[in-house]
Amino acid sequence: MPLPDRTAEAVHGSAPTNPLDWAAQAREADMPSLVREALQRDRAQLAFQPVVTAGSPPQVAFYEGFIRLLDPAGRVLPAGDFMGHVEETALGRDLDCASLRLGLQMLRRHPSIRLAINMSARSIGDGAWRRVLDAGLAPGVGERLILEISEGSAMLLPEVVTRFMAEMQPKGVSFAMDDFGAGLIAFRHLKDFLFDCVKIDRHFVAGIESSPDNQVLAEALITVAHQFEMFAVAEGVETEAEARHLRALGVD
């Protein structure tokens, strides 16, 4: 999709009059260039979030690594600012490569951690991404790598994803499904997929202690996960009340 023509907007008088708004629009329009430059200049890094068990005391089961980029001034570009501009382009595959490379480096440096890295179904057919993966699966690394793919992405190419899982799991690699229950998954595919873990979509988690609908849906998703011997994780737990109710429903 072509970027908006800011010059044309200025001619017709629809450009913002506030300099800060103008700067924000210009930055947004130039986001693909910012992403490209950040990758070329090695200004990519991972932010880490722990995933903890529901037991008492809670323990870190693994960490999630999220790609972050720095602008020329060293400020962090939140993923929400740039991902929508590039995720369906070649730059999106470059981001996947950078994320995987950084994750594998972290696993080599810290032999006691497990780490989940995001990928997409399209990454499987990307030669550069596969070379990064194959080169980084040193002994002891594959067993601690979790590749995380969204429910929607998995359903785009289910046969490709299934074959890739069958190839990687003998090497110790685990797989997690993100956004489980978001609405695209056909449950008949679950018996074919080889996911080790599912992450229940945050929409079923928010305010669950006071939402009968979310309680029923979350319990159903947890039951499905356990039926297929998958570890059930709840996304976006923010309060103790949510955590307490999810523990009662059987989340792992």
Task: State the predicted function of each range.
Residues 1-30, 34, 81, 85, ...:
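Cyclic nucleotide signaling catalytic output domains
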Residues 16-83, 118, 177:
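Active-site core of bacterial EAL-family cyclic-dinucleotide phosphodiesterase domains
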Residues 23, 27-30, 87, 91-96, ...:
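Signal-transducing alpha-helical linker
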Residues 59-64, 91-160, 236:
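Catalytic core of bacterial c-di-GMP phosphodiesterases, primarily the EAL and HD-GYP domains
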Residues 80-84, 93, 166:
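Conserved long alpha-helical elements within nucleotide-processing catalytic cores of c-di-GMP signaling
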Residues 130-134, 160-164, 212-219:
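Charged helix-capping and loop-helix junction motifs
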Residues 136-208, 224-252:
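The catalytic core of metal-dependent phosphodiesterases that act on cyclic dinucleotides
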